[in-house]
Amino acid sequence: MENKTITINGVEYVKKNSVQQIEIDGEFMYIGKNYYIRTVTNHYVGKVVGLNDKEILLQDASWIPDSGRWSDALRTGDLAEVEPYPDRCVVGRGALCDYSEWLHDLPRIKK
């Protein structure tokens, strides 16, 4: 039986070829779904209506200057501050840090 780990200076390491490799291909963001998007400088909430390699087009979009407690905002949909766009906005994918599906009504009232 082949040994799958090695210990060096008291630290146990796993051999790379002993771990199952999973290839992931495709998109994780889908047109027609609502997302909370965090970029390097701003946060947005909106419905994705267009998507290409460089940009995301959001409908019923809002800029979120302050989400409040992050996990509470995602769980309840309650945001500390909301600045709605009149309709759409474009977010550059190059500035994207992360995004989460927004499972609540999109905020459309300034707060």
Predicted regions and their residues:
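Conserved RNA-binding domains used in RNP assembly and mRNA/RNA metabolism
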Residues: K4-V11, K16-K111
